[in-house]
Structures are given as C-alpha cells and as structure tokens.
C-alpha cells in the first residue's frame, strides 16, 4: 500500500505577519508611538549596527553605533537650538550600555568643555576640562570630580600642581603665584593650605611682584617639623 504524506499544516496567518514585522538588517525610518524616529540597522528586532535616533520631545539626535538596542561604540549626541533650529553637538565619543564610556568630548557650553576618559557616564580617568572663566584643569578624575594627580591653571596664569580629592586640593602640592612671583609648597586639606613653605619664585618677571622679597628662614630639622605637622592631618601612614 503506497504511503501518503500528510498535507503540510498551514501556518497561522498571524505568524506570517509577525515574521514580516521582525526587523533585521538595514531599514528605512521606523517611527515609535511617541513620535521618535530611528533609521539604520537592526538585528533580532533591536537597533544594532549603524543608525540615527531622533527624540521628538527631547529635540535631540544620536548618530553612531548601536548594540542590542543601546548606544554602544562611537557616536555623537546633539540637541536642537530653540532659537535657530540647528543641532548643537553635546557629546562625541565612545559609549557602552547607553552611557558615555571610554574617550570622548562633552560640550557644556560654547566656552566650556571636557575631553578625556569616561566611565559609566561620568568623567573618570585622565581628562582635561576647559572652564568658561578661562581656567583649565588637566589630570585625573573620579566620579565626575578631580581626584588623584592634576594641574589647575587659572586664567591669570597662576597654577596648582599636586593631589586632589573629591574636587578639592588635598594632599601635597605646589601653588605658583606667578602674578606676584611666589611659590607655596606644602600640604592641603579640602582646599585649605595647612602646612608648607612660601618662597620667592620668578619675582623679577612677575607683573605684580610683592613690595619686598621674602626673607630666607631656616630650621634645624625641616623634615621633622613637616612630618610632625602632617601627622594630625593624614595619620602615621600618609
């Protein structure tokens, strides 16, 4: 008796529609219910590859790399100027899991920006910050604050070189008062100089030198005096 194959069971029509709706590869613009728009590549129904996303309510745009539906890789985020309608660059650099991560530049205003390393959306690692008032900080960051070794150059060309903690001068450091020709070297605690020495430094070239030079003062055991003064501030092991 000949074998008769059973007829192939027809797939429900909803499965056919669902398969057609699945997004993979390059697609033209796809609109969300809230008005957002995405144009670019997809994988397994997620934004993946190169693409551009426009937020309608935020009036902002991201152009760059995507991975599994999140910004990941290199990309640029811009916001629309309410007066001109043009898009102004806010951040250009690397992303991971939808957050700034790696090396990138963030523009806080036309005259204030940061270029350097990021971690989980915060400035972390090495970076340089240009402030609107003309000050420049270059050095280490942690949790969006100066932490570690760094140099702050003020707009008047005075500068601090040394240790930082939580955005404040903390630990050993040097402050160059180039406008009056003096140098302070010592220990700082939460932005306040606690123990150190002040000497003349480049006084003849300073634009506003002090009226009289600092007299030279010496102690028999300067290292011992400094250590004794620092101990209450940092303890025995610092």
UniProtKB/Swiss-Prot annotation:
Q: Which InterPro entries match?
A: MORN (IPR003409), MORN3 (IPR052472)
**Could you identify this protein by its name?**
MORN repeat-containing protein 3
Subcellular location per UniProt equals: Cytoplasmic vesicle, Secretory vesicle, Acrosome
Which is a Pfam family this sequence falls into? MORN
Gene encoding it? morn3
Quick one: a GO cellular component term? Answer: acrosomal vesicle
Give the species: Xenopus laevis
Query: Which SMART domains does the record associate with it?
Result: MORN
State if Transport is listed as a keyword. Answer: no
Which segments of the protein form a coiled coil according to its record? none
**UniProt-listed Gene3D superfamilies:** Histone H3 K4-specific methyltransferase SET7/9 N-terminal domain
Q: Does the keyword Repeat apply?
A: yes
Question: Per its database record, what is this protein's job?
Answer: Assembles a suppression complex (suppresome) by tethering SIRT1 and MDM2 to regulate composite modifications of p53/TP53. Confers both deacetylation-mediated functional inactivation, by SIRT1, and ubiquitination-dependent degradation, by MDM2, of p53/TP53, promoting a proliferative and cell survival behaviors. May play a role in the regulation of spermatogenesis.
Query: Mind listing the UniProt keywords for this protein, alphabetically?
Result: Cytoplasmic vesicle, Repeat
According to the record, where are the MORN repeats?
38-60, 62-84, 91-113, 114-136, 137-159, 160-182, 184-205
């Amino acid at each position: 008796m000949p074998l008769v194959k059973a007829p192939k069971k027809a797939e429900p029509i909803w499965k056919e529609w669902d398969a057609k709706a699945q997004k993979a590869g390059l697609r033209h613009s796809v609109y969300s219910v809230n008005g957002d728009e995405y144009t670019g590549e997809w994988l397994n129904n997620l934004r993946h590859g190169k693409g551009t996303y426009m937020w309608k309510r935020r009036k902002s745009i991201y152009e760059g790399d995507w991975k599994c539906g999140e910004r990941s890789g290199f990309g640029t985020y811009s916001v629309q100027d309410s007066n001109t309608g043009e898009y102004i660059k806010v951040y250009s650099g690397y992303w991971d899991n939808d957050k700034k991560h790696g090396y990138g530049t963030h523009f806080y205003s036309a005259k204030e920006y940061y270029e350097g390393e990021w971690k989980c959306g915060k400035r972390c690692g090495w970076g340089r910050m240009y402030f609107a008032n003309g000050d420049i900080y270059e050095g280490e960051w942690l949790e969006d604050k100066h932490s570690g070794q760094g140099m702050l150059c003020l707009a008047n060309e005075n500068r601090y070189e040394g240790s930082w903690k939580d955005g404040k001068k903390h630990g050993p450091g040097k402050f160059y008062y180039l406008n009056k020709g003096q140098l302070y070297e010592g220990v700082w605690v939460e932005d306040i100089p606690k123990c150190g020495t002040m000497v003349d430094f480049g006084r003849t070239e300073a634009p506003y030198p002090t009226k009289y030079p600092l007299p030279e003062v010496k102690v028999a055991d300067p290292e011992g005096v400094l250590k004794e003064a620092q101990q209450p501030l940092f303890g025995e092991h610092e």
